[in-house]
Amino acid sequence: LQYRAADTNAADNQIKPSFNIKNNGTSAVDLSTLKIRYYFTKDGSAAVNGWIDWAQLGGSNIQISFGNHTGTNSDTYVELSFSSEAGSIAAGGQSGETQLRMSKTDWSNFNEANDYSFDGTKTAFADWDRVVLYQNGQIVWGTAP
């Protein structure tokens, strides 16, 4: 799983991670079996909203959900899951970019500097093990906090 920070400002009112899933295996992977989790602190009590700003797979094929989490530099995760219409990733292929944007309902600032999955130095796609990829409920990439 590759990650890049589309917004490197750690102290503004939006979190903008982008993702690219690479299939290093020898057979196609059905995207509907995969989920991506990005871990962060929501820095306050306001609820968090999420949007897919753009995705090569088509934003309508990606669902966004949020969950509570207790771990190092995280109290919340955002999970991206894929519909069957998203298709599959061929052996040796990749999903293409998915651009996620999150903000709080009151538009207050985040402090991403203390977020487990944030790395503002990653401005181009790079492998990043602090964003976790699940397949059929099992971790296949990354380390959860």
Curated annotation (Swiss-Prot):
Superkingdom field: Bacteria
SUPFAM superfamilies linked: Carbohydrate-binding domain
A molecular function (GO) term: cellulose binding
Regions that span the bilayer: none
One biological process term in Gene Ontology: carbohydrate metabolic process
Residue stretches making up the CBM3 domain: 1-145
Protein name: Uncharacterized protein in celA 5'region
Source species of the chain: Paenibacillus lautus (Bacillus lautus)
